[in-house]
Amino acid sequence: MIQLLSFLSISFLYLYSNVFGNSLVSIPTVVLHGIASSASNMDNFSNWIETSFNTKVFNIEIGDGFKTSIYSPLTNQLVELCSTIYENEELKHGFNFIGMSQGGLLARGYAEQCNKYQVVNLITLVSPHGGVIYDFNWYAYSSFLQNHLSIAGYWRNPTELDKYLDKCSYLPVINNEKNTSVSDIQKTNIKSLKNFITIWSKNDELIDPPESGKFSFYDEEYNVIDIEDTILYKDDLLGIKYLAENNRFHIHETNCTHAQHRDPICFPQLYDILKLYL
């Protein structure tokens, strides 16, 4: 009788966790590297996630990793990313997606435009959601660089917003800053996330401005505009405001440098954040 009761108790807990979502076994997690990087650069991070949060981790890369992350436009990388995920049957019931830097923009692109295998929690580490700009002039909005350099896809010159909206091939599309054939589905898919977590750092020496990691960016005078004051948020172009109002959009901050977010030195800070969602 005792053995029977034990069996029934275990069976009930199993059914409860699967039917009501009170998960006893974590869903899988996908990790995606950033620019000028590859899956091997995320090995320490992926192993730490797997052991710390009892989740099976798939540490993936696009193309050959390093070269593809630099020289392939993000529109092409996104197509390959979606195909790579759809090849993995273990992800078909849903997964958490952690994207590092540029990888966070691709992870968000997957959640918005693909998502046949649904993203549950979308987590981005120091990802330039607001774009990047640096102290030199170049032809970022030329068709050549848009087609041959990934960073051009999220280059945002605050003094040339018309060019950004017209010529930039990736970020204004996934931000719903311009109306496209995928605008409605992107907003629907973002609103379907259980949680959208952005992690940024004032000590991020690579992303300019660092606040881009939380959807903020410069105005024409190079003053940082808080996310709540952006058109993207105020007009809820993408569904971020909807998530925030329902306590499903979360901004967290570390004091790590950009690359440290994938290294053990930053793990204690990341643990305190990620334990809330994984």
Feature roles, as predicted:
Residues 121-278:
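Helical cap/lid subdomain of alpha/beta-hydrolase-fold lipid enzymes
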Residues 23-55, 59-63:
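Short, surface-exposed "cap/lid" segments of acyl-processing enzymes
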Residues 30-35, 98, 199-201:
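Short hydrophobic segments within beta-strands
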Residues 1-10:
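Classical eukaryotic N-terminal signal peptides for Sec-dependent ER targeting/secretion
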Residues 33, 75-166:
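Serine-dependent carboxylesterase/thioesterase catalytic core
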Residues 66-78:
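Catalytic nucleophile-loop/oxyanion-hole region of alpha/beta-hydrolase
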